[in-house]
UniProtKB/Swiss-Prot annotation:
Name used for this protein in its record: Proline--tRNA ligase
A Gene Ontology cellular-component term: cytosol
This protein's UniProt keywords: Aminoacyl-tRNA synthetase, ATP-binding, Cytoplasm, Ligase, Nucleotide-binding, Protein biosynthesis
HAMAP family: Pro_tRNA_synth_type1
Gene, per the UniProt record: proS
Subunit structure: Homodimer.
Highest taxon of the lineage: Bacteria
Gene3D superfamilies on file: Anticodon-binding domain (3.40.50.800), Bira Bifunctional Protein, Domain 2 (3.30.930.10), YbaK/aminoacyl-tRNA synthetase-associated domain (3.90.960.10)
Name of one Pfam family that matches: HGTP_anticodon
Length: 603
């Protein structure tokens, strides 16, 4: 195929779009691949659609290789299946909801678990029909509060989502492993570096979960890794729990006056003045000796606002993403929630809690925090708060703190939650060394859903003994539009895009540089010969465009090989340039086609 720029629907831009924040967004718009239709919504232009289709083709090939079959669901879905799994409510404000003229409720699909489950339920009824894997490549919709970064976080996007159906957990393990291997092949063929990391299931539910992250400083996800091979999304990192301590000989807790000490820093200063410690007793007080009780407000999908207090060592901050990922095991919810620091109105309703001096209570006989305490608020603690650890914390009175409060002796808690920030240097939970942190973009996510959706929608089959068994499921997603953006993010320079050959909109970009008919005819002839050799060609045949603009557009568009026909034609040579390395060679005209074909097939 030869795309003639004189006919191609394309306009390149010299300046970055004003709303663009990241390289991929800037360059995809400037090079004429996409155009913004509305915040978080983009139109795909011919060159962009070519790249998108090549990404989709690679995904289809690898899905087919593991036996997955393609289907296509509507994007507009009825409310009822999502009501059955509670996700109509649980998705909160992130779900696009609408009504038809008769008042019936519909949604624009964020994911299709329910529809896949119902389809299999409708058609299959025996263990002999399993295992089964189905997939689709389809538009998805999420009402992002702040769409950003072009295709990386939009309101409409394309995903490949697949689902496996098995009779037992062993089958699910096999399906999960097959999809995991397929994903690694997909990203390898795309030329995109990804790292599989342990993850939490979030709104999807289920047990085992992994994300495939593209490492980049602009990523919204933080992950950790160790030299020994531990990788995890920061939300999934578990704390190395200290041993419990015998507190039988620990001295009684004591309340001290600590005026004007509402912060950890002021408390530590006061502690070192009021109750200095010798080196044998632990040395100077530090923030790590204090128990900071953070009051959070959780807005449930129903709109109800629930207060939660989390006790953490004072030298640690609370990571709201980690709280959000792990709070579901302590509250009867799933799906999207709102999470923020409690405000003044929240605290007014809880007079037992004195801002800056909040503590769990002075003894087990008079608990303040916890569902059994006077405040009746859920009290969770960091895993480092184990029985026998001793703390300085608030006494629930203005200007007073309690020293020597012993966990398990003087206070208890409703549960333990992974909530604090993960730091570089923290030990890996598997003992593989200290952690280092990095940022990345989620390119794919795989889940062992188990029986959550099958139970909710009554998907059962007859087993070998003629008994009804609930099917176990896996869910596997790849962000297709996000993959295009990540490829653009990873493959560019100061002149424009530099596509990998596997997804480039063409194999070679032919530029006719000069005004003579001979130059144009030679460039056209080479373009047609390259097409006949099986290559996709962009031919810049624009008659009234300067050589500088043509070369600038060729580098901006980012096809891997640029073939320029110009003044060298009088000597029987053309220039062939590798877009990525910048290396250029003069090749004789009669060898140019073979040279380019060889470059395409060997690089």
């Amino acid at each position: 195929m030869v795309l003639r720029l004189s006919q191609l629907f394309l306009r390149t831009l010299r300046e970055d779009p004003v709303d663009a924040e990241v390289d991929s967004h800037k360059l995809l718009v400037r090079a004429g691949y996409i155009r913004r239709a509305a915040p978080g919504i983009y139109t795909w232009l011919p060159l962009g659609l070519s790249v998108l289709r090549k990404v989709e083709d690679i995904i289809r090939q690898e899905m087919s290789a593991i036996g997955a079959q393609e289907v296509h669901f509507p994007a507009l879905l009825p409310r009822e299946p999502y009501e059955a799994t509670n996700r109509w409510t649980e998705y909160g404000e992130g779900l696009f909801r609408l009504q038809d003229r008769k008042g019936a409720d519909y949604l624009l699909a964020p994911t299709h678990e329910e529809m896949f489950t119902l389809l299999v339920k409708d058609l299959y009824s025996s263990y002999k029909d399993l295992p089964l894997s189905l997939y689709q490549i389809q538009n998805k919709y999420r009402d992002e509060a702040r769409p950003r970064a072009g295709l990386l976080r939009g309101r409409e996007f394309i995903m490949k989502d697949s689902y496996s159906f098995d009779i037992d957990d062993a089958g699910l393990d096999a399906s999960y492993a097959a999809h995991r291997a397929a994903y690694l092949k997909i990203f390898e063929r795309l030329g995109l570096e990804v790292i599989p990391v342990a993850a939490t299931a979030g709104a999807m539910g289920g047990s085992k979960s992994e994300e495939f992250l593209f490492p980049t400083e602009i990523g919204e996800d933080t992950f950790v890794r160790s030299a020994g091979g531990y990788y995890a999304n920061v939300e999934a990192v578990t704390t190395v729990v200290p041993d419990e301590i015998d507190f039988s000989n620990a001295p009684a807790a004591e309340v001290l006056d600590t005026p004007n000490t509402p912060t950890i820093d002021t408390l530590v200063d006061a502690a070192n003045q009021l109750a200095p410690r010798s080196e044998s007793d632990g040395g100077a007080w530090t923030a790590a000796d204090t128990l900071k009780n953070v009051v959070l407000a959780v807005t449930l999908p129903t709109g109800e606002r629930q207060i939660v207090v989390i006790g953490v060592p004072g030298d640690r901050g609370v990571d709201l993403k980690r709280v959000e990922a792990n709070i579901g095991s302590h509250l009867p919810i799933a799906g999207e929630i709102g999470l923020e620091a409690a405000n003044e109105e929240d605290l007014k309703k809880l007079p037992w809690l004195v801002k800056g001096y909040i503590g769990p209570g002075l003894s087990l006989d008079e608990p303040v925090l916890g569902l059994e305490g006077s405040s009746k608020v859920l009290f969770l603690v960091d895993p480092r708060v184990v029985s026998g650890t001793t703390w300085v914390t608030g006494a629930n009175a203005e200007g007073k703190h309690v020293f020597g409060l012993v966990a398990g002796r003087d206070f208890v808690w409703d549960g333990v939650i992974e909530s604090t920030e993960v730091r570089a240097g923290d030990p890996a939970p598997d003992g593989s060394g200290p952690l280092e942190t990095a940022r990345g973009i989620e390119m794919g996510h795989i889940f062992q859903l188990g029986r959550k959706y099958a139970e909710a929608l009554d998907l059962k089959v007859l087993d070998q003994n003629g008994k009804q068994q609930v099917v176990t499921m896996g869910s596997y997603g790849v962000g297709v539009t996000r993959a295009v953006a990540a490829l653009a993010e990873a493959n560019n320079d100061d002149r424009g895009l530099v596509w990998p050959r596997s997804v480039a909109p063409a194999d070679v970009h032919v530029v006719a540089v000069g005004r003579g008919d001979e130059i144009f005819e030679a460039a056209e002839k080479l373009s047609l010969e390259l097409e006949a050799a099986g290559l996709d060609v962009i031919f810049d045949d624009r008659p009234k465009v300067s050589p500088g603009v043509k070369f600038g557009d060729a580098e901006l568009v980012g096809v891997p090989t640029i073939l320029a026909v110009g003044r060298g034609l009088v000597d029987g040579v053309v220039e062939i340039k590798d877009r990525r390395s910048g290396e250029a060679e003069n090749i004789s005209v009669d060898k140019a086609v073979d040279y380019v074909v060889n470059a395409v097939r060997t690089r």
